Amino acid sequence: MENGQPSLTALTATAARAAHLIVDHEPLIFADSLALALLGDRAGELVSYHELHAAHPVLAGARTQVTCRARYTEDSLARAAGRGVTQYVILGAGLDSFAYRTPHAGGLRVFEVDHPATQDWKRRALAAAKVAVPDGVTFVPADLAADSPAGPLAAAGFDAAAPALVSWLGVTMYLTQGAVGETLAAIGGFAPGTEVIADYMLPEDMRDEAGAVYGTLVAQASAERGEPWLSFFAPGEMTDLARRSGFGSVRNVRQRQTIPAALWRRADALRPADLAVLFHATVTAPSRAGENLAKAHPPAGAKDGETGVSTARRARC
């Protein structure tokens, strides 16, 4: 990652969201109206690949993956907000645009946790597009590849005693299984009712043909740019890991299940694949590991005995 620039992973994910509005047919899966603007002067270059090769399995697969996971997460967030949840944590926020284009974002405190270089680039892109940063948005700079964001999040005012929705997308495959477990244990220390939505990659023997083709090509490209995939999980493994981390309600959602069935009746190249699965779990009893991290990082101004946030050890921007 270069100073003042986001990672290529963040750029390509944003380009896929932007291209969905340009090259794919109705019905749209997800409408990110700011993705193109956030790409800045890289927009033409990155989106042109999709325009020229819309049906290529890697490009069509990327658009399918990023739009389905974003749609599912933001639909879940809307339901959580309707139940009174007021905190939204985006681990590895990248160029996520939720807080700048969504009407109900005004009732939420949004904590965008990411590498300072990505956040600097994003601030400049927002300014260039004349998009104001809402009062409820807090940028939490953290080198998520090396350090725990627990301290920065606590200092930013996250209330670990109140439930939140935690989005952790496009990250776990770049972490070891041990690091993923540490992250889940940390999130499991949040208040009961907290939800986490993350995606993970299936092992090769659990992928269908489309998932195998896309996974092989993208894993190779990721490794070549220095961001190799390091972990893969069977759904049962993720469920067991979650149960040990304080999560009661656990769902593993296949890509086909992430959006309404009617949206798969399409005339473009977007098709569901068995490669990435969405993990959606709810904290019922805070994990001991998470509680210990929370105690180690009380929020700014907290009195003795009050606890703060605990969250992911590492993430990719």
Predicted regions, residues:
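Rossmann-like AdoMet
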Residues: 1-89, 93-140, 147, 160, ...
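A short, conserved alpha-helix within the catalytic core of class I
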Residues: 149, 174-187
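A short acidic, Gly/Pro-enriched loop at the edge of an enzyme's catalytic core
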Residues: 151-165
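A short SAM/SAH-binding and catalytic strip from SAM-dependent methyltransferases
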Residues: 163-178
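Acceptor-substrate binding/catalytic loop of class I
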Residues: 175, 221-235
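Conserved beta-strand signature within the Rossmann-like core of class I S-adenosyl-L-methionine
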Residues: 190-204
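Short alpha-helix
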Residues: 229-255
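Core SAM-dependent methyltransferase catalytic element
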Residues: 262-289, 317
